[in-house]
Amino acid sequence: MFDIGFSELFLILVIGLLVLGPKRLPVAIRTVMGWVATIRGLASNVQNELKQELKLQELQESIKKAEELNFQQLSPELSKTVEELKASAEKMRTALEQKAAATNTTLEEQIKEIKNATESTSQTLTEQLTPSEQVTEATTDDVLSPAEQAELAEENDEMVYIQQYYPDDDDEPVFASKVKPQTEEIQDKKA
């Protein structure tokens, strides 16, 4: 479809890995593949509907030509075929209208599903952020470019990862005058 070679695809994956990181790259790939599948489905639906419309239009044109040739002058066999053409054209028209009605509802449902999915992912991401990160994100999103926003998000992820293993020290600093030197403790134990 896009005529992308293996080397170009590999380059895109490496850039995606660098920009998004190993945690978010699979999620991004799944999201993009979902969009591609949705777009392909919509394109095939449109293509099928166009084909049916063209067939219907051709049938209607042939019917009009037959009517112009004066329907009574035709032989009985030809009049039967014209009637059959009219009946098949009417069947195709009703089927096409039903499919169009069904497609409109399914398209609306698909759009709602995609919106709900994006809203739920954004809500889970904001729930995971601390209030200070939310304030920082809210103030910087308006000013930063998408690349800078991605970099900032990556830095925030790294900070969350670091804070998991190295929690902040909330204790007050201990001064050297309050701590006994270890050499005195060792000497006291020997004595």
UniProtKB/Swiss-Prot annotation:
GO terms for cellular component: TAT protein transport complex. Residues 119-139, 168-191 are annotated as: Disordered. Its main location: membrane. SUPFAM superfamilies: Apolipoprotein (SSF47162). It is a single-pass membrane protein. Keywords: Cell inner membrane, Cell membrane, Membrane, Protein transport, Translocation, Transmembrane, Transmembrane helix, Transport. GO terms for molecular function: protein transmembrane transporter activity. Residues 181-191 have a biased composition (Basic and acidic residues). InterPro entries: TatB (IPR018448). It comes from the Bacteria. The chain crosses the membrane at residues 1-21. GO terms for biological process: protein transport by the Tat complex. It is found in: Cell inner membrane. Residues 119-138 have a biased composition (Polar residues). Part of the twin-arginine translocation (Tat) system that transports large folded proteins containing a characteristic twin-arginine motif in their signal peptide across membranes. Together with TatC, TatB is part of a receptor directly interacting with Tat signal peptides. TatB may form an oligomeric binding site that transiently accommodates folded Tat precursor proteins before their translocation. The Tat system comprises two distinct complexes: a TatABC complex, containing multiple copies of TatA, TatB and TatC subunits, and a separate TatA complex, containing only TatA subunits. Substrates initially bind to the TatABC complex, which probably triggers association of the separate TatA complex to form the active translocon. Belongs to the TatB family. This is Sec-independent protein translocase protein TatB. It comes from Pasteurella multocida (strain Pm70). The lineage of its organism: Bacteria, Pseudomonadati, Pseudomonadota, Gammaproteobacteria, Pasteurellales.
